[in-house]
Amino acid sequence: MGFKTRIEAAISDAINLGQTAPSPAKLASALHYAVSPGGARIRPTILMSVATACGDDRPELTNAAAAALECIHCASLVHDDLPCFDNADTRRGKPSVHRAYSEPLAVLTGDSLIVMAFQILTRHASIDPQRAIGLMNILAEQTGMPNGICAGQGWESEQKIDLRAYHRAKTGALFVAATQMGAIAAGQDGAQWDELGSRIGEAFQVADDLSDALYNEAELGKPAGQDDLHGRPNAVTEYGIEGAISHMKNILGGAISSIPRCPGEAILAKMVNAQAEMLTPVKWRSKYSNLHPGE
């Protein structure tokens, strides 16, 4: 069974449990709407890739970890789109949750998905209680304060922004969660996988900045030009387009070098290369192809 199939099945099972009667029908519908259709499911795919590279001896726990992580990510998107933050009308090519269901239901949807993430892990804790506790700890750390995605959103309310801390929390946190949780689900030390997650997260932040500057709303499936609109710091402003692409490639080259020794090390390196290709804007792909460690 492929990663995508495993991820979708685990998320579907969790959402179905949240829709068991009696439950408020509109909120139940909004939960399903918020997680589907799934985007690239990049974070849970990275989690499963790391778990597989480490042996994946508890696949059901890996599935649960992947679904929990994606629930947190989807919750962050729902909250990020709210009028009090980005006030975005669209997400993944369709109306954002607050536009489709109302602002109060969007708040509740995001909150419910956060709770659901930890419910998923507790339901599967009997598979390996020690690993499950580790998964919950990492997910909590990378969601809340002081370094998780909540902190990342909080930085946008500060008069003076620590750019590195902002990017590390806003985007990087869930990538760190992905690599560490993948290792923990397979019985390995998650701390060794921190640098890989940090580097992938940093690269994705640069890629997001590039997309925001280069593509329109129809191409992105969400509002474009948000960094300029909200006065947010970004890599394009700092480095320019080509400089930002080179910076992203250097980050990902370091990511490959940071992969801990494991049975699937070579496969993981190929995955990072594939992500680099996907993240590079189409116009520049031929120029910046064939990434190698240290470039």
Can you say where each PLM-predicted feature lies in the sequence?
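Terminal targeting/low-complexity segments that flank the catalytic cores of oxidoreductases
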Residues: A276-E295
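N-terminal amphipathic/basic leader segments beginning at the initiator methionine
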Residues: M1-Q19
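Mg2+-dependent prenyl diphosphate-binding active-site environment of isoprenoid biosynthetic enzymes
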Residues: P22-T280
